[in-house]
């Protein structure tokens, strides 16, 4: 690494960005069971088990509400076709509450399979890094002390923005994991609404929302792939310009590309819902 402070500041900001980008590639391929050593997952499973007992109790309540709403009288309930339909609904709803965790894990594994396929086809890995061009390093090192003063201000501002964007990006990806845990923990309660016809829309909405959270990983990976291809071609800088102009142009274009990536990752949930009509 160069001994120049301005170069070091820019490189440190890029290293932070590259580190967070590599963390994203690791996070999107992890499962809730392996995230942070599985400690959080064990607690979530315990909570899910406790919620399951509540869900089964609510199952009966929603079933009774459904019977009262859909059947006009007790005589109608006694009809074989109605009784059979109600029994099948109750059995299916109970199975969904009992095996809801397995259902949710199956949905997650399908989305992870798509993520793995996209990463394999693209051949883009976490090793794709943003690197400070040699032309920028040469221009900065060729500056005198007084010429480098405005460069300090430019690199401080640019480095700070890059660092902030790095943390915003990684926080969004961590937020996806937190949402997965939250959905898993309380799953039995919304799933119990399948027992009643008037309340089943809540259960459908829950499964759609959970599927959208799982599919966010695909949008995040695609966004990172597109950014990696952008980053492989450094911004074009006019070498005949002053060093401060070159650095400002480079940082401006770099931050613009980073803003596009961060914005897409932050809106991944909205993008999925618009694509899938969820």
Question: Which residues does each predicted region cover?
Answer:
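Non-cytosolic segments of integral membrane proteins
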Residues: 94-186, 224-277
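Binding/recognition "hotspot" determinant
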Residues: 1-58
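Hydrophobic transmembrane alpha-helix segments characteristic of membrane transport
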Residues: 58-94, 186-200
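Hydrophobic alpha-helical transmembrane segments
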Residues: 53-65, 157-163, 180
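Short amphipathic alpha-helical coupling elements at transmembrane boundaries
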Residues: 23-26, 82-89, 116, 120, ...
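Alpha-helical transmembrane segments
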Residues: 191-208, 240, 271-277
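Alpha-helical transmembrane segments and their helix-start/interface "positive-inside/aromatic belt" motifs
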Residues: 1-10, 80-100, 203-213
């Amino acid at each position: 690494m160069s001994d120049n402070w301005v170069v070091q500041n820019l490189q440190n900001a890029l290293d932070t960005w590259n580190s967070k980008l590599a963390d994203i590639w690791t996070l999107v391929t992890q499962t809730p069971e392996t995230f942070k050593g599985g400690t959080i997952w064990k607690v979530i499973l315990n909570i899910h088990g406790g919620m399951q007992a509540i869900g089964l109790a609510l199952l009966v309540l929603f079933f009774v509400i459904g019977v009262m709403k859909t059947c006009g009288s007790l005589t109608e309930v006694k009809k074989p076709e109605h009784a059979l339909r109600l029994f099948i609904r109750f059995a299916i709803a109970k199975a969904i509450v009992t095996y809801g965790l397995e259902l949710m894990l199956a949905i997650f594994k399908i989305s992870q399979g798509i993520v793995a396929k996209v990463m394999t086809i693209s051949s883009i890995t976490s090793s794709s890094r943003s690197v400070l061009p040699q032309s920028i390093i040469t221009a900065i090192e060729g500056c005198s002390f007084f010429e480098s003063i405005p460069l300090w201000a430019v690199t401080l501002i640019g480095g700070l923005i890059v660092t902030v964007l790095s943390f915003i990006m990684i926080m969004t990806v961590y937020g996806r994991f937190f949402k997965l845990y939250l959905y898993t923990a309380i799953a039995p309660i919304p799933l119990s609404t399948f027992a009643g016809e008037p309340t089943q829309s809540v259960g459908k909405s829950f499964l759609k929302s959970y599927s959208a959270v799982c599919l966010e990983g695909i949008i995040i990976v695609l966004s990172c792939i597109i950014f990696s291809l952008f980053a492989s071609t450094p911004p074009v800088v006019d070498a005949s310009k002053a060093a401060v102009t070159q650095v400002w142009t480079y940082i401006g274009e770099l931050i613009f590309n980073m803003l596009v990536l961060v914005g897409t990752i932050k809106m991944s949930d909205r993008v999925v819902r618009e694509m899938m009509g969820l």
